[in-house]
Amino acid sequence: FILLKDVINEVGADIARFVMLTRKNDAPLDFDFDKALEQSKDNPVFYVQYAHARASSILAKAETELDLEGSKKFLLKHFNLLLQMEERSLVRLIALWPKIVESAAVKREPHRIAFYLNDLASCFHALQHKGKINPEFRFIRVGQSDLSFARLSLVRATKSIISKGLLLLGINPVHRM
């Protein structure tokens, strides 16, 4: 067996905590050091942290390229512009956040938050990847400020939820990787 302090020394407290919280409290834990240090989607803490860092980067870029004054109004006002399947999936997942937190608290099952954050990160990465392949689906669309603001509202909500979720789990969100 390995002592928890040795695990923390090897991978860091945030990684150790997240990996532990991806298991039910009555389930055995097999800690895979290689996976915990991997920088890929197979490492849930990296995947979630990377989504937060990407969202931070996208919003920082938007501040330099767009006038973000009043952009808080756009989520509801221009919701009808979010037509892509990945956008709608992200909206549905974002809407689940309050129920996830309540369920995790009532049932004393913090792994629900960790699972949800991983799902949210996956959905966000899929949407971002679609924009890399096809410029039509990028978050920031020159000449289409309404659509850009609607998409940036999704980015802002995703970043906010990941940040709050990680903090609830006692993990510090990263803004750059």
Whereabouts are the PLM-identified features?
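Non-catalytic interaction-recognition regions
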Residues: F1-M177
